[in-house]
Amino acid sequence: YAFKLMGVLQRASLNIITNPYPNSVLQNRTDGYPRRRGCTRVDELLAAGVNVCIGHDDLMDPWYPMGKGSMLGAANLLMHTAQLSGYDQIGQLLDMITVNSARTMCLEDYGIEEGNSADFVVLDADTPFDAVRLTCECLYVVRRGKIVCETAPARRELRFGGRTETIDFKL
């Protein structure tokens, strides 16, 4: 049934939004053990050509008061709950919080191109893999070509045996 439904979703050009934070906490919480993860069939939907994006709709409310609005955090959690940890799947996760979401919202001027609104973020990561793996800091948020938010990354120092070393966990 699910396979047939995915074909219908794709032909109807419907969009699927998965919300990893609240879904992982709220769905199936009355199940016995082993408990299901509360996550949809993301990999199967993507393989069927369905547009899937990641949402984060509960920030500080009664259903999920632990949210902080990090889309990279939501992608990281989905990476675990949907078992999308392959190197080739990291790009799909990033697309789900950018390109696929823009498609869901019918944004026509999306992307970095002449004439578009120049909305983008600068991440503290050397690779897309590290961006998702480390849920790195967003150094800059640029909206309509102007910096609207700037974050100084945290600095971690390990002190051991009289030595101090800076640790960033990057590969």
How does the language model describe each region?
Residues D31-G32, G67-S70, C136-C138, R156:
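Short, glycine/charged-enriched secondary-structure capping and boundary segments
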